[in-house]
Every structure is written in structure tokens, then in C-alpha cells.
From Swiss-Prot:
This is Ribosomal RNA small subunit methyltransferase H. It comes from Syntrophotalea carbinolica (strain DSM 2380 / NBRC 103641 / GraBd1). Keywords: Cytoplasm, Methyltransferase, rRNA processing, S-adenosyl-L-methionine, Transferase. InterPro entries: RsmH, SAM-dep_MeTrfase_MraW_recog, SAM-dependent_MTases_sf. Its EC number is 2.1.1.199. The gene is rsmH.
Length: 314
């Protein structure tokens, strides 16, 4: 099979470097290395002897990163795995702490554009959506096995879909005759199920359902919560972490986690004086989430929804 071209534009590259400020000789983790775009920038900034550990759940992305970053030789170490497992992976490499961590969340352009991965409804493909195609349930498994109540919960919580129950009931009805196995089947089902689904619109009516299924299949929000907690523990004092999110659910988790680590007193409101003596663990490097510039969005429309937040460990 001919190798597909891995096209992925790294989002907000200048802003990422400004937040992380990589220096020569430092050690970084790119927890979602993808095609290696951000990783290359970090490796260039940490030359001549800096080290980058690149992680990714997607083996195809990891293979592409290996090709793109081959010129850096032993300065880059690539490992297959979820960034939530970074502590274990770094321990295997005898690395206890690092100077910086980058998490670029969401689906890469390559994953969206590769029809057989099943992330997009733009073409007909198997309903898969797994980041790691070697493990776990596919999106087809989910829509054909779960109860309509559970499906509605997934669509509502992970996709913020207002017609969650209606879509779930339609799935239950359709799958009774034949299983839903392709992206086109599901996209057309959603279009038929929701009011105005066939009215031309900039946003496809199945967008939120596909997002919700992808998040559920890959346990993305649970991985993010665990990954943030473990990543912070890996940072040296003064170390920096930057996170790029692409939808409100992710950004809310990142924002709340960072704010909780900045907090000082966590005593109950009724106490007259502070008794916890808690000191903040981090300093915010971004008071508000940073957004891509208009010029970047014009060149890379997928950057429109990106939000960058960063912290420095105290």
C-alpha cells in the first residue's frame, strides 16, 4: 500500500515557543507528537544537546514523526503511548523530571483527512475513530451495542448535542434492521433525525455526534485529567507546560486544573483565618487562553478553534 501523505500544520507555533521558552540542553516532552511540527521547533531551540521525548497513541503518526525528526538522531526518543502514561514511559527512560511539556489535543489533520480512520463524515469509511487502532472499541461497536439512554448521555455530555435523545432513538430503530458500520450511514442518520438536518449549513448536523463518539471511544477527557495531573508532577521547578485544546470541554478542564493549582487558601469559606497554609504550585503564563492570529487562521482554518494555555511550576 502506498504511504499516505501526512499533512499537518502545527498550530500557534510562535506562541508555543514563547510559552515554553526552550533553552539549549533542556529536556522536553511532546505528549502528542503527531507529525513532529512542534517537536522540531523545540529540538531546534534546545540544540545542540537538548532532548525531546515524543509520545503518541497513533502508531502512524509516530512513524511519520520518526521520519520527520530523523535528522535529530539520538536527541529525540519516540514512544507509543498515551500522554497520561508519561510517568511510566519516562521512568523506563530513566528520566525523572523535565523542563517542559507540550500537549496538543484533538485530532490531527492527517487523521481527519485519512478516510479509513473514520474520524470524518466527509467521505464514506469504516466507523472506527480510534487513535490507537490496536486496542479498544470502535465507534461502530459503540453505536451498535450501547443502550439509547447511554448513547444520548454520550452525545449530550461530550458533544453538547441538543437533539441527543432523538438521535439515539433513531440509532436504536435503524440498527434493529442492520448495524451502522460506516461514517456515511451515521452522518445521514443524524441528518434525517434532527430538525432542519437537510437545510444547507456551514456546520454539518453530525459534527457534534462525531465529536462525542471520538471523545468516548478514546476516553479523551479522562486521559486529559490524568495527563494534566501527572504532567505537572514531572515538571522541574521553573518548568513550563503548554496545552492546546480545540473545544470547550477540553479547554474547561485545562482552565479549571490550572486555576486549582494557582489557588492559595482552600479552607472552608466560614473560617475567619486561613488554616491550610496552602501555597500555589504554579504560576499562570496565560491569564486568558491565547487564540490563533487571523493570518494563521486564514492559512490554516483548523486553528480557529485552538486555545493555548500555559503554566510555570513554582
Amino acid at each position: 500500500m502506498t504511504r499516505e501523505v501526512f499533512q499537518h500544520s502545527s498550530v500557534m507555533p510562535e506562541e508555543v515557543l514563547e510559552c515554553l521558552r526552550p533553552q539549549p540542553g533542556e529536556v522536553f516532552v511532546d505528549g502528542t507528537v503527531g507529525g513532529g511540527g512542534h517537536a522540531r521547533l523545540i529540538l531546534e531551540a534546545t540544540a545542540p544537546d537538548g532532548l525531546l521525548v515524543g509520545l503518541d497513541r497513533d502508531r502512524e503518526a509516530l512513524e511519520e514523526a520518526g521520519r520527520q525528526l530523523a535528522s535529530f538522531g539520538e536527541r529525540v526518543l519516540l514512544r507509543h503511548g498515551n500522554f497520561a502514561d508519561a510517568t511510566r514511559i519516562l521512568a523506563e527512560l530513566d528520566i525523572a523530571t523535565v523542563d517542559g511539556i507540550l500537549l496538543d489535543l484533538g485530532v490531527s489533520s492527517f487523521q481527519l483527512d485519512t478516510a479509513r480512520r473514520g474520524f470524518s463524515f466527509q467521505s464514506d469509511a469504516p466507523l472506527d475513530m480510534r487513535m490507537d487502532t490496536s486496542a479498544g472499541m470502535t465507534a461502530a461497536d459503540v453505536v451498535n451495542a450501547l443502550s439509547p439512554e447511554e448513547l444520548a448521555r454520550i452525545f449530550r455530555e461530550y458533544g453538547e448535542e441538543r437533539y441527543a435523545r432523538r438521535i439515539a432513538r433513531r440509532i436504536e430503530k435503524v440498527r434493529a434492521d442492520e448495524p451502522l458500520m460506516t461514517t456515511r450511514q451515521l452522518a445521514e442518520l443524524v441528518r434525517d433525525a434532527v430538525p432542519g438536518g437537510h437545510v444547507p449549513s456551514r456546520i454539518h448536523p453530525a459534527t457534534r455526534v462525531f465529536q462525542a463518539l471520538r471523545i468516548h471511544v478514546n476516553a479523551e477527557l479522562d486521559s486529559l485529567r490524568e495527563g494534566l495531573r501527572r504532567s505537572l508532577a514531572l515538571l522541574k521547578p521553573g518548568g513550563r507546560m503548554a496545552v492546546i485544546s480545540f473545544h470547550s470541554l477540553e479547554d474547561r478542564i485545562v482552565k479549571q486544573f490550572f486555576r486549582s493549582e494557582v489557588q492559595t487558601c482552600i479552607c472552608p469559606p466560614g473560617l475567619p483565618i486561613c488554616a491550610c497554609n496552602r501555597k500555589p504550585g504554579v504560576a499562570l503564563l496565560t491569564r486568558k487562553g491565547l487564540k490563533a492570529s487571523e493570518s494563521e487562521i486564514a492559512a490554516n482554518p483548523r486553528a480557529r478553534s485552538a486555545v493555548l494555555r500555559a503554566i510555570r511550576r513554582l
